[in-house]
């Protein structure tokens, strides 16, 4: 297995953050990202970049972090107990975008690299990441295009890659207590190292580079769609699912909190406004019911 080049991965991630922020600013056309660099007492640091109250995006956060530690946290060793006691480095770019317009989906993307080392032993490393889409008022053409782009990203790496990571995404972004998916999925991968460093890194780069290719056309198509208070209230209600998933199930959030990560950056994914409603049930045949009936369960889109 080829030797990991940590510096090359870090350089790519910093550049990716810059390029995604530039692309999102261009899509918004009004607001700009404020950068907030931070250091972590236990080792490492990062830069959080947040755009708020834009013409298109109510809030968009794009975070780069590179943290180091002397021992692995419980969230990372739960399914890899052999890694307990190793020092680690974790780096990645993570983003969440909450648009103003309920007809534009919320989206999340993340690419990351993890390496754990111990004197006298080979390093253990892997890549992870993916992206997923959470519409409020979905359009089938948007969802199909999103998944076609996902499939195109995976194609050079083998025909089995897209179905595998699409299925993993559907399974990961699932709320058992609601019995529904968080959205319409995309790609999710983790523990990627079996093809060696170069090939694994290439796939992670393809996913990171492909995110805006998948998302930008949907934003452009829907950003002028008119909406009213009904759509806004439903958007705020459905954002509650995002909060529930991230605080209860998301491994990245739990890892960050357990490793003493920067709380503001970890919770950057939270929507700026959200609401809950007791025992909400959409009206039969309504656009809101369409989301529940046709989109919040795994489907083959391409």
Swiss-Prot record:
Disulfide bonds: none annotated. One of its GO terms (cellular component) is cytoplasm. It is found in: Cytoplasm. It is an enzyme of class 1 (oxidoreductase). InterPro entries: Coprogen_oxidase_aer, Coprogen_oxidase_aer_sf, Coprogen_oxidase_CS. Keywords: Cytoplasm, Heme biosynthesis, Metal-binding, Oxidoreductase, Porphyrin biosynthesis. The keyword Oxidoreductase applies. GO terms for molecular function: coproporphyrinogen oxidase activity; metal ion binding; protein homodimerization activity. Its EC number is 1.3.3.3. The keyword Cytoplasm applies. Pfam families: Coprogen_oxidas. GO terms for biological process: protoporphyrinogen IX biosynthetic process. PROSITE patterns: COPROGEN_OXIDASE. Pathway: Porphyrin-containing compound metabolism; protoporphyrin-IX biosynthesis; protoporphyrinogen-IX from coproporphyrinogen-III (O2 route): step 1/1. Involved in the heme biosynthesis. Catalyzes the aerobic oxidative decarboxylation of propionate groups of rings A and B of coproporphyrinogen-III to yield the vinyl groups in protoporphyrinogen-IX. Homodimer. This is Oxygen-dependent coproporphyrinogen-III oxidase.
